[in-house]
Swiss-Prot record:
<dbReference type="Pfam" id="PF13393">
    <property type="entry name" value="tRNA-synt_His"/>
</dbReference>
<keyword id="KW-0963">Cytoplasm</keyword>
<dbReference type="Pfam" id="PF03129">
    <property type="entry name" value="HGTP_anticodon"/>
</dbReference>
<dbReference type="GO" id="GO:0005524">
    <property type="term" value="F:ATP binding"/>
</dbReference>
<keyword id="KW-0648">Protein biosynthesis</keyword>
<dbReference type="InterPro" id="IPR036621">
    <property type="entry name" value="Anticodon-bd_dom_sf"/>
</dbReference>
<dbReference type="GO" id="GO:0004821">
    <property type="term" value="F:histidine-tRNA ligase activity"/>
</dbReference>
<protein>
    <recommendedName>
        <fullName>Histidine--tRNA ligase</fullName>
        <ecNumber>6.1.1.21</ecNumber>
    </recommendedName>
</protein>
<keyword id="KW-0436">Ligase</keyword>
<dbReference type="GO" id="GO:0006427">
    <property type="term" value="P:histidyl-tRNA aminoacylation"/>
</dbReference>
<dbReference type="GO" id="GO:0005737">
    <property type="term" value="C:cytoplasm"/>
</dbReference>
<dbReference type="InterPro" id="IPR041715">
    <property type="entry name" value="HisRS-like_core"/>
</dbReference>
<dbReference type="InterPro" id="IPR045864">
    <property type="entry name" value="aa-tRNA-synth_II/BPL/LPL"/>
</dbReference>
<dbReference type="InterPro" id="IPR006195">
    <property type="entry name" value="aa-tRNA-synth_II"/>
</dbReference>
<dbReference type="InterPro" id="IPR033656">
    <property type="entry name" value="HisRS_anticodon"/>
</dbReference>
<comment type="similarity">
    <text>Belongs to the class-II aminoacyl-tRNA synthetase family.</text>
</comment>
<feature type="region of interest" description="Disordered">
    <location>
        <begin position="1"/>
        <end position="24"/>
    </location>
</feature>
Length: 495
């Protein structure tokens, strides 16, 4: 017997809210992401990359990047324990699962292994404007080739993929550098400790934001910002500071070859720097053979990515489009993707160095950037044709009409609410329907249908009513024989 105190609280109503950092997506966003992925996937497959999908969860020790606490490894990731008391975590990118997959299946994989993947990833980080805890990522990698030409193909594929996704030539660029050049520079500049090297690279990474003078201060004793906060510098002395600044400014408007010449003069005498220079030269040669011009991909010595991750070439995709938000304010998207060579990731599993290189971008971020530039991915929304309902007794006729349209490949629906004519028209408009189909008793008896062209109404509302030829071509409402329904609707949709 249940007491009153044990009765469930039927008055409780949970608040309808999404968790912080997670967003619902409606058709517009999903259509945009699908269009981008279809376009990019077609490019990647032309390059001989095969699709791969791995599970949302990996064992936490396989991820490796976020493991501060062996008792509860959930810093940066969403983790849980399974029934075997093993920690699992939602993947935070698509590269770590690839490394696990490659190590697990290495003996049976074709080598080099070329794959691309896309899907949701999760980050247990503080959310903010435009920063979500779940987002769609697209990733392409070659595992098992140490050739710089493998890096070049990834870069070329990224260039073509972004163009196919809706960024015409001149609206985005791939910037290329090499960690070995940076390491050689650090040695030549006398940066001895790991902390000092990290401070130098972090200073270089701020070149776009602080300019040469600001970076000079951070390379030296430090910098006092506008708020009065002091950032301790790397502690380099005069000549070493000049050497670093000469390197990061070695980029040339004369193209990749001219930049390589400039870099060679700065890093001369460094064995690791010379190795990085040779790799960049081979990347440049391969890109030229692949038809990738200097305005599509260029060498930028100031690019610093993945300070403890990348081992060779690094690259970053930067958006050059002028973008605005919904209020018309200018918005800077900056980097929209990046990648590079990471020869140590698979070795975590095998103990053997396995060369790898790849590129990834955030699909949702790219869709937002395209939209901010006035380029709607996937095209404008187009809802279904809506069949208006007048009388329950005629439901068979309504479904016959909607079936006729669907059989012809036209998206259509019967209105299944209980509202009258005016609310039904408003519903069709909110759905983005190109047209509505009406069958009253008179039309049914006469074997006709009435079609109202909602696209025509929308265009008229935008001030296009003076276009007499257009109005004659697409009358706002017409009654036609029922056997002409499909052709008439197709004419409206094809407009």
């Amino acid at each position: 017997m249940t007491t009153d105190s044990e009765q469930p609280n039927t008055d409780f109503r949970p608040e309808a809210r999404a968790p912080r950092g997670f967003a619902d997506k409606r058709a517009r966003d999903l259509r945009a992401e699908r269009a981008i992925l279809e376009a990019v996937s077609a490019v990647y497959e032309r390059y001989g990359f095969e699709a791969l999908d791995t599970g949302a969860f990996e064992y936490a020790d396989a991820l490796g990047k976020f493991l501060p606490d062996s008792d509860r490894p959930n810093e940066g990731v969403f983790a849980l324990q399974d029934d075997d008391d093993q920690w699992m975590a939602l993947r935070y990118d698509l590269t770590a699962p690839l490394a696990r997959f490659a190590a697990q299946n290495w003996e049976t994989l074709p080598k080099p292994f070329r794959r691309y993947a896309f899907g949701p990833v999760w980050r247990n980080e503080k959310p903010g404007p435009g920063r979500f805890r779940q987002f769609i990522q697209c990733d392409a990698d070659t595992v098992g080739s140490a050739r710089p030409e493998a890096d070049a193909e990834i870069i070329a594929m990224a260039v073509e993929g972004l163009e196919a996704a809706g960024l015409p030539r001149g609206t985005a660029v791939l910037k290329i550098n090499n960690r070995k050049l940076l390491n050689g520079l650090l040695t030549a500049a006398g940066a001895d400790s790991a902390g000092q090297k990290l401070a130098v690279l972090r200073a270089v990474d701020k070149l776009d934001r602080l300019g040469v003078d600001g970076v000079r201060l951070l390379l030296g004793e430090g910098r006092l910002d506008e708020s009065g906060d002091f950032t301790k510098g790397a502690g380099l002395k005069g000549k070493a500071v000049d050497q670093v600044l000469d390197f990061v400014q070695a980029g040339s408007t004369g193209g990749r070859a001219a930049t390589l010449d400039n870099i060679a003069r700065v890093v001369a005498g460094s064995a690791e720097g010379d190795e990085g220079l040779l790799e960049l030269s081979r990347i440049d040669a391969a890109l030229s053979s692949l038809g990738i011009a200097d305005d599509q991909a260029f060498i930028d010595p100031s690019i610093v990515r993945g300070l403890e991750y990348y081992t060779g070439a690094v690259f970053e995709a930067e958006l050059l489009l002028s973008t605005t938000d919904e209020k018309g304010n200018k918005v800077s998207f900056g980097s929209i993707g990046g990648g590079g060579r990471y020869d140590d990731l698979v070795a975590r599993f095998t103990g053997n160095v396995t060369p790898a290189t790849g590129f990834s971008f955030g699909v949702s971020r790219l869709a937002a950037a395209l939209r901010a530039a006035g380029r709607e991915p996937g095209g404008a929304a187009r809802g279904p044709v809506v069949v208006i309902t007048f009388d329950q007794a005629h439901m068979g006729e309504y479904f016959s009409v909607v079936g006729q349209l669907r059989a012809a490949g036209i998206a259509a629906e019967v209105y299944l609410g209980t509202s009258g004519m005016k609310p039904q028209m408003k519903y069709a408009d909110r759905r983005g329907a190109p047209a509505v189909v009406m069958l009253g008793g008179d039309e049914i008896a006469a074997g006709t249908v009435t079609i109202k062209d909602l696209d025509a109404g929308r265009m008229a509302a935008e001030g296009l009513t003076d276009n007499a030829a257009w109005k004659a071509e697409r009358p706002g409402q017409q009654t036609i024989p029922r056997d002409q329904l499909v052709d008439a609707v197709r004419k409206i949709i094809g407009g």
